[in-house]
Swiss-Prot record:
Pathway: Amino-acid biosynthesis; L-lysine biosynthesis via DAP pathway; (S)-tetrahydrodipicolinate from L-aspartate: step 3/4. InterPro entries: Aldolase_TIM, DapA, DapA-like, Schiff_base-form_aldolases_AS, Schiff_base-form_aldolases_CS. One of its GO terms (cellular component) is cytosol. Pyruvate binds at T44, I206. Catalyzes the condensation of (S)-aspartate-beta-semialdehyde [(S)-ASA] and pyruvate to 4-hydroxy-tetrahydrodipicolinate (HTPA). One of its GO terms (biological process) is diaminopimelate biosynthetic process. It is found in: Cytoplasm. The gene is dapA. This is 4-hydroxy-tetrahydrodipicolinate synthase.
Length: 294
């Protein structure tokens, strides 16, 4: 589907409504700086608070702006298999290139339940499906063995966004899934684990940081893929303060504050999320200046 950097793009709001004008500027910023994919309406896109009509407007506008230049992947996960399928079919109808399907949260399915969830959806769509494993938010962890079973059996499940920060799991996730199917892709779901996942044989990152620093995140991956390990490590180390600052409060609170400081969007979120504290805004201002982004 893509190799490198997929930006998990924010959803801008203004006076409580979608701000498509600011959104277009942000999408073009991503395209101009060489990102390899856009992930719309994921965690960073505040998908739980975007209604069905807004989803359609946002996905349609994204596809218009991108115009086939890079893949557009739409977040479509819920904790109901049938509701998830409905969102998948909406994305399919609109012309998305793929869907990001988070593991069902709160109801805590077993590993067999996880497998059956993805099997059910994969049998009912032709879209490429990306499994999203983020145990810190969902309360359930996709084991590497389960992911390998999915990779072996479900051919339109194209890869996994691995947001378990455990280095051992990352290594086993890449190893076992690629043994099961050589073209199965593994992307980091944590910006600060991107370099380590690449070293383990992974394929890139679905990134929050690239909202504000797309050029630098693209460089981190591109240098690694070109065999320039030291340069990739250097970029990773330079980005560490920004990676840390963008997660001092719950994502996407800090990244929206950062994009506001950069002049891209209003610093507006939907409840239950609230804007960043003054302390966080000041931290972000300093880190952005030190990173040459302000």
């Amino acid at each position: 589907m893509f190799r490198g950097v997929g930006t998990a793009i924010v959803t801008p709001f203004k006076n409580g409504e979608l701000d498509l004008e600011s959104y277009e500027r942000l999408v073009r910023y991503q395209l101009e700086n060489g990102v390899n994919a856009l992930i719309v309406l994921g965690t960073t896109g505040e998908s739980p608070t975007v209604n069905e009509d807004e989803r359609e407007k946002l996905v349609s506008r994204t596809l218009e702006i991108v115009d086939g230049k890079i893949p557009v992947i739409v977040g479509a996960g819920t904790n109901s298999t049938e509701k998830t399928l409905k969102l998948v079919k909406q994305a399919e109808k609109l012309g998305a290139n793929g869907v990001l399907v988070v593991t069902p949260y709160y109801n805590k399915p077993t590993q067999e339940g996880l497998y059956q969830h993805y099997k059910y959806i994969s049998e009912r769509t032709d879209l490429g499906i990306v499994v999203y494993n983020v145990p810190g938010r969902t309360g359930v962890n996709v084991l590497p063995e389960t992911a390998a079973r999915i990779a072996a059996d479900l051919k339109n499940v194209v890869g996994i966004k691995e947001a378990n920060p455990d280095i051992d799991q990352i290594d086993r996730m890449v190893s076992l899934t690629k043994q099961a199917r050589s073209d199965f892709m593994v992307w980091s779901g944590n910006d600060d684990r991107t370099f380590y996942l690449l070293c383990a044989g992974g394929d890139g990152v679905i990134s929050v940081v690239s909202n504000v620093a797309p050029k630098q995140m693209v460089e981190l991956c591109a240098e690694y893929f070109s065999g320039n390990l030291e340069k990739s490590r250097e970029v990773h180390r330079k980005l560490r303060p920004l990676m840390k600052a963008l997660f001092v409060e719950t994502n996407p609170i800090p990244v929206k504050a950062a994009l506001n400081l950069m002049g891209f969007i209003e610093n507006e979120l939907r409840l239950p999320l609230v804007p960043a504290s003054e302390k966080t805004v000041e931290l972000l201002r300093n880190v952005l200046k030190e990173s040459g982004l302000l």
